[in-house]
Amino acid sequence: MDKAKAQQEIGKLRAEIERHNRLYYLEAKPEISDFEFDKLLERLIALETEFPELVTPDSPSQRVGGGITKEFPTVIHREPMLSLSNTYSIGEVSDFCTRVEKLVAAEGGGTPEYVAELKYDGVAISLFYRDGLLVRGSTRGDGRQGDEITANLKTIPSIPLRLQSAGGSLFDAAVNGEVEVRGEVYMRKDDFERLNEERPEEERFANPRNATAGTLKLQDSAEVARRRMSFVAYYLKGHDGEAPTHLRRLEQLKCMGFMTGAAARLCKGMDEIANFIGEWSEKRWTLPYETDGVVLKLNEVGLWDRLGATAKSPRWAIAYKYPAQQAKTVLQGVVFQVGRLGTITPVAELKPTKLAGSTVSRSTLHNFDEIERLGVRIGDHVMIEKSGEVIPKVVSVVLDERPAETAEIEAPSECPVCGTKLERHEGEVSWYCPNEEGCPAQKRGRILHFASRNALDIQNLGESLVSQLVERGFVSDAGDLYSLTQEQLASLDRMAAKSAQNVLDALEKSKKQSYARLLFALGIRHVGAATARELAHACPSIDRLREMGEEELAAVPDIGPVIAASIRDFFAKPWVAAMLEKLAAAGLPMQAGEEKALVNTNFEGQSVIFTGGLERHVRQQAEEMVRERGGKIVSSVSKKTTLVVAGKEAGSKLEKAMKLGVRVIDEDEFERML
């Protein structure tokens, strides 16, 4: 094909792909299947590969990702990205309206009008367009500065790479100058469920917001592209021609190619605001994405600067948050699940009941200490709550409604999967199955852990596939994964030749992971990711590690006698020795390589612990940021701890730190230290 014909076909493909993106993400009216869409994109990429001089920054091919970002530069926001004041009280919303009315009256204005919008439960970002082209995207950060994550944001189909013509002076300003758009990146419920299905149970995200926050800070933009995210715009700032009202600006954003909140409504007083909040209290559960409240903004944008802001939030807006959803149901029974280490976890079987827009029939009871604390029995009426988490929890027993006949929840005596007599470790609350080699549940759990994101990160090796591999006898341990054939994989349910090859490719890629990750992936009891890194540093090979005695191991930082004994027990098992031989033969990293260079030394000499919920970071990634800057992560507060990063609802660790006089900082200060 000559260049002229290629250019013509590329133009048609780009227009067609963007049209289907708009139909899917903005209008929810898809016309073709994912497979057909992928074929269009593959053809475009093939042509652009053949004719690289025809690639443009706004081509749909630029959404695919593939680059690795070693660190995210800091961006200073031109205008602070303030957070909104939150309230759970309708009365406080009314007080807000009264304050605004007084402030507007003092400015000589009339009766204010408000725009009510649903509050998306996602991550706030800023986008900058120059001459209509997306040039930079960043996180909110601490409000004054954030991280530049342009490459990751370009993978989100609902973020235009080039602004569409909105007509009028605003678009003229966008084409000839700069426009800033702010909004929320979020993950739809179905995309979130799909992502979690691919991960082992212990590595699953608690909710879509956590998944979104973690995904945006990934270094591999190809992985970001694979996890589908969406964007909703709610703020527009250009040089000239912005509409005078917030509602009109939302319309302009839509014309420029952005998705805006579909439910935005003009409200002329508190009665209309209360009606909007009440209307969406239940209706929000029918939406395909998570919303946790309603945002109210003064409609007249010209008054925003005049009303001003406090140090943290604007005076012209407020967020009403819906309270955590609770429901009453009956605990009908308890089943017991078996984890990768044989631990038995009780799970409540509930009378199906509606909660937060879905039917709930199960809830974790954690362990027998929790059962005792709650005083719960089979047959009890219980209150369950869903507050951000995917899995609801039993929060209390309705003792006034306890039936005459209830049954105590008894610990099982045999493994519910393999029938082996259960045992209990001294000083622990949980029972466990000692049949490590033969229990199918433990085999599945160990392999899923081995493939999990913080271990060897083997894509496409999800729970359903691993269950089939174990049931069919194709694998018994992680070492068997590397002997799988395409024929074996293709013979499984919901697997075709291409899917089988994807798994084999992912297994091959996993051989390039670090020695420290392999140590964590082995699933040694008490050895988490941080301990595995210490082991990798102190013991440069698996062979050396297997030779070390308990005293020598206990001298390694963060190990101690209990973990040392666990490591020795693990390597003494014949099935472990056989698995290690298979892993070595497959080419896995059985010894340490070159250490990764530090980003900086800002945390050098610091022993850091995180407690409570972080708003803008996933815990594991925040800990990795500390390590990349020379710091050490510890699991408990002691006199040796030098720094505590406290998030929302920090508990006993914060209290202990205060008593010991350990320095405590919040998430904003943590980001400044990076």
Curated annotation (Swiss-Prot):
A molecular function (GO) term: DNA ligase (NAD+) activity
Entry cofactors: Mg(2+); Mn(2+)
Coiled coil: none
Catalytic residues in the record: 119
Disulphide-bridged cysteine pairs: none
Biological process, per Gene Ontology: DNA repair; DNA replication
SUPFAM superfamilies linked to this entry: BRCT domain, DNA ligase/mRNA capping enzyme, catalytic domain, Nucleic acid-binding proteins, RuvA domain 2-like
Domain BRCT: 598-674
Binding-site residues, NAD(+): 34-38, 83-84, 117, 140, 184, 297, 321
Record's GO cellular component terms: cytosol
Keyword Membrane attached: no
Binding site for Zn(2+): 415, 418, 433, 439
Broad enzyme group: ligase
EC number: 6.5.1.2
Catalytic activity: NAD(+) + (deoxyribonucleotide)n-3'-hydroxyl + 5'-phospho-(deoxyribonucleotide)m = (deoxyribonucleotide)n+m + AMP + beta-nicotinamide D-nucleotide
Family: Belongs to the NAD-dependent DNA ligase family. LigA subfamily.
PANTHER family on file: CHROMOSOME TRANSMISSION FIDELITY FACTOR 18, DNA LIGASE
Function: DNA ligase that catalyzes the formation of phosphodiester linkages between 5'-phosphoryl and 3'-hydroxyl groups in double-stranded DNA using NAD as a coenzyme and as the energy source for the reaction. It is essential for DNA replication and repair of damaged DNA.
Protein name: DNA ligase
Name of encoding gene: ligA
